[in-house]
Every structure is written in C-alpha cells, then in structure tokens.
Amino acid sequence: MNIYDELGIPKLINAVGTYTVVGGTRMSEETLRDLCDAARSFAEVEKLQDILNRKTAELTNNEAALLCNSCSCAIYLATAACVARHYGKNFNNLTAEEISRCEVVALWGQHIPYDHAMEQLGVKIRFVGFPNMQAEMSHSVVKDAINSNTVMCYFAPRTPDGYYGEGCMNLSDFISIAHSCNIPVLADGAAQLPPKHNLWRFTRDMGADMACFSGGKDLCGPQASGLLLGKLELLKIATELSFPRYGCGRIMKIGREEMVALYSAIRQYVNADEEARLQWCENEVKKLVSNLAECKHFSAERTWPNQAGQPLPRAFVTLKSETTTPAQLRDILRNGNPGIICYSENRPGVYINPMCLADGEMEQIIARLKEIDQQLQ
C-alpha cells in the first residue's frame, strides 16, 4: 500500500499535460534519488544555492540563474530586481510609496492570472493593446506606454497556435522597443518547454534580460520549483532578495531538496534526446487513432501543437453520441478504473495528451474508451 492508498486518494492517468491541478509532472528516478540524497544530509544553504545557480547557468547557456520555488516566485523576484535597479538602491530600503509608483508594461492579450505575482510586489501593470485581437499591433502603442516610472516590460512568449493571437506582437520587436528605452524585459516561459533551446533562446539568442520557467512542468523537477535565468546584473539582485536571506523573498522558501532535485532535472533535460521523445509521443497518438477507428461512438485524429503551443502532438477524440455530453464523458473517464483526467477545451469530445503518460498508460486509455463505447447508447 502506498501513501495515496492509505489516504484514500485515487491515482489518475494524466492525459491533459503538465497542469498544476493534477500534480504537474513526474520526476525521474534519478531526480528522486538526488532529492533523497539532499534530504539525508545538511548543507549551508547559501553555499549550495551559489553552486547550483552557477552550474545551472552553465547548463542553460545563460550569464546567471536562480533556482526558486515556482515560476510565480521567479516573476516576483525578477520584478523586485528591476525595481531595485530603477532606484539604484537596496529594495529592502524602499518605501511602499516608492514601490507603488513603479510600473510594468505588458500586453492585454497576455493578461493571465500569473501576472498577479508582479502586483503582489506593489507595482502597477500598465496593459496595452487589445485582448486576443487578431490584428497587427503598432510599435508606438508599447513605446508610448513606457514612462519615467516603468521598471520592466513583461512578455509571455507563445506560438501563434497557442494561447494568444498574433496581434500580441512578437518577442523580438517587444524587446527592441523596451531596450530602446533602456527598460529590461522578462520573458515568462513557464510552460514553453519543449523545445529545450528556449532555456537560452529567449535570453542569449533573442535578448530578453530575464526568462522564467516552471520547474514542475516539462523540466520534470519538483512541483514546487521554478527557474529564473538571464543577465548577471539583475539575477544578482534577485538572488540577494531571495530565500534564505531576509527581505521580500524570504516567504518564498525553497528547500535544499527541491533545489538539488531541480538542478538534477535540468541536467537531464538539456542532455535528453528531444527527437526520441517527440517520436514516442507521435507513436502514442497513432496508437490511439488506429485503435478507435472501429468504435461506434468515437473517432480520433492527431492535432498539433498542444494547448500550450508546445511542439508535441495530441489526439482529439470526437464524441459521436447524441445522449452523452463531453462533460459527462470527462466525468466517466475521471471516475472510472483507472481514473483518467482529460479536457475538452470547448470541443465535442476530449483531448488525449501523451506528454505526461508513462509506458502502458495509453493502452489503458484505449481499453477504457472501448469499454465506454460499448456502454453508450
């Protein structure tokens, strides 16, 4: 009996992807071993942090890195670093009034719940443009929003087929506009892995001053971990404000276990075979599509990319029953044995995303869908 059995918590097959609400991802056995090794012995946290940050920067081709407890934490600390840079003094010596005068420029079409991390610091977000408008945005819209109180420009990179419309402007132009006004840019790439080259593409190749990523998504680190990468000047400030030091980042504690495990996961990730992983996902999708071909109430097709714009395939299973809704199908799958969690995204069926599946789980999904097919009227 494992801990979930003891607690009476049903284990699920994750067919949605790296969503926090279902636990994000799985750590590898190597990562789990490194996490346990870190837990068994004490270490000076600041010394451990310095070494892990330096090695992570080397692995990701960045000037500097900071391992923290979430991507939201990375956004918060990046913003604090930019506020400190703006005033040219220690953030911890600033007044609430001084912080409240600071502004971050962002795009309306990228307004997401996670940008509250910046507002929690006390700064204001100045949104420009229109939400999800499928039209080209003028560069002057962004440039005119930058003023003497602007400390940072925030951008959430996505592919055109991902969350946001093309009207949001591209990252290269956004960086160019911000830098023409001497304002640093944070690229929020929380779920923008794969491809792994995004770990250095946004910063080293495209010029963003900082980029942040979730550690608990495709990096396959601990769920409570995040990564901030970028310019040494800003990362040095962010590190000085982070745990275990006193100040605004003290509340965002990350244990030695999570730091070591995240570093281990990153090391494995940058050395992994992306093509082999892509081919595995393609094979899983083909397996589902071919096995549902004879079903009466289901048909399946390959879709691309996935919901976060990541370059990985999914399958969409169309529900052809007139007596069962997609919501009911999701409930049947979630409450079955095995429990399978999947989303519909306002379409007449369910998506099956292979990115978090283990070997053999697609076969269980296929068997369950065939069983449901026999039961539907």
PLM region descriptions:
Residues 245-246, 334-341, 369-377:
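A common structural junction motif
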